[in-house]
């Protein structure tokens, strides 16, 4: 049997609700084109028979485009008209009388295959006589009774593979197996150029075009479930390192730290914070100058020389920025001493001196007034500064926000200039949508290979594979281990063998090792029972 390979590339298998699996033309097929020849005298390919069996016979009122004609022991199939794209292939059986009425010369040109188109005999598979008889019986059944109805059982003895010696108990098993030997893929997807040898694989592929496999994090379409499983850990790990803007999105109601893009506004906010470190400005004079320029440039800000008289010239004096502890004022000391004296007099008894009580109350009022006037006035809160229009109008600098995420290596004696930012963000960290990384197992990620571990202990042990650290050293030899269990196994199998001879020298060595490791929680040294009995001692020879 031979089948035209160009014809196979011009058709595809589709599922029809009324007719089941049918052949549809994907390219235009010319008139008089020979599709295939079935010859009983030569071995025939069962895969080709299954493909040709998909050509349904035309019903009454339907126009057939494929004609089938039989001559001697050969059956020829050819196109009887031009088949357009999307047209279903329909078969018409011609009797010998109808064939005789036609021009024999034209039929020979349209039906007979050329010698160069016929398959090489060396490519055909050699089969036994029983296989030939079974296959010929299948061909005879198709020729006499027509196509197989879905669910119809072929005749007995026809479920054997024509290429290999395998046999099957059902026609569906033989049909599914036959695609293994066929290099062609008749089941093609109508949305993409992919094709498959089995219809079940095509049905599974159609899920990509219907719902598909979508990543819930980045909404990306994956071609298969395996690709989605491989993509999700990488995508979820990338989501942990989003910019600071996404982490502070929940703070937009209170002014939002996301609207603070540049250093001048950061310094302006910092100076109005209650615990801003003056030592930072003393060590960074350029930052102080930049802060002063920004404060004077803003229309609502008040400069130090703004309240001066217009007639008197403004003079700039150097400001002492050294952070020195402020001594307590005399009024506060007097208030404290007088309050203590008043408590002593009240403990002795009521002396009836109302004037002293009034004088003490007056001193307290004066001291509290003096203390309140000496405090630095704060006219704006941090939330008001963050909500300023000039701060929200500027663009976000992702580089600066990334720098805020990293820990700055400042002197421990000097407080960090960004401590107030961390304090504010920590106050509402629970309201931030990205403050929690989803599940606890995604928090510990290796910085070398990006692996994720559920516990910090697992990550610490994994990091030693990259750094080569071996903190667990053997007490007997010079070997070191990265895992404590490996050290314990080494000591148990190498140094503490059960057949070791017990000598006074070994007793002395084990006792000294026991004293040196008595504070540890895990003891890997094996001791002799005499060392643990009260009142017993092992004689140790003098060296």
From Swiss-Prot:
Residues 299-380, 496-543 are annotated as: Disordered. GO terms for cellular component: nucleus. The positive regulatory (PR) domain is required for egl-43 protein stability but is dispensable for anchor cell (AC) invasion and preventing AC proliferation. The C2H2-type zinc-finger domains 1, 2 and 3 are dispensable for anchor cell (AC) invasion and preventing AC proliferation. Residues 335-348 have a biased composition (Basic and acidic residues). Residues 2-62 are annotated as: Positive regulatory (PR) domain. Disruption phenotype: RNAi-mediated knockdown causes defects in anchor cell (AC) and ventral uterine (VU) precursor cell specification and AC invasion in the larval L3 and L4 stages. RNAi-mediated knockdown on a lin-12 mutant background reverses the AC-deficient phenotype. RNAi-mediated knockdown reduces expression of zmp-1, cdh-3 and him-4 in the AC. RNAi-mediated knockdown reduces expression of fos-1a in the anchor cell (AC) approximately three-fold. RNAi-mediated knockdown causes defects in vulval morphogenesis. It holds the Pfam family zf-C2H2. A zinc finger (C2H2-type) spans 159-181, 187-209, 213-233, 444-466, 472-495. It is found in: Nucleus. PANTHER family: C2H2-TYPE DOMAIN-CONTAINING PROTEIN-RELATED (PTHR24393:SF124), ZINC FINGER PROTEIN (PTHR24393). Residues 306-317 have a biased composition (Polar residues). GO terms for biological process: negative regulation of transcription by RNA polymerase II; nervous system development; positive regulation of transcription by RNA polymerase II; regulation of cell fate specification; regulation of cell migration; regulation of DNA-templated transcription; regulation of mitotic cell cycle; regulation of neuron differentiation. It comes from Caenorhabditis elegans. Probable transcription factor, required for migration of the hermaphrodite-specific motor neurons (HSNs) from the tail to the gonad primordium during HSN cell differentiation. Required for phasmid neuron development. Required to specify the pi-cell fate of ventral uterine precursor cell (VU) cells. This is Zinc finger protein egl-43. Keywords: Developmental protein, Metal-binding, Neurogenesis, Nucleus, Repeat, Transcription, Zinc, Zinc-finger. GO terms for molecular function: DNA-binding transcription activator activity, RNA polymerase II-specific; DNA-binding transcription factor activity; RNA polymerase II cis-regulatory region sequence-specific DNA binding; zinc ion binding. It comes from the Eukaryota. Residues 513-533 have a biased composition (Low complexity).
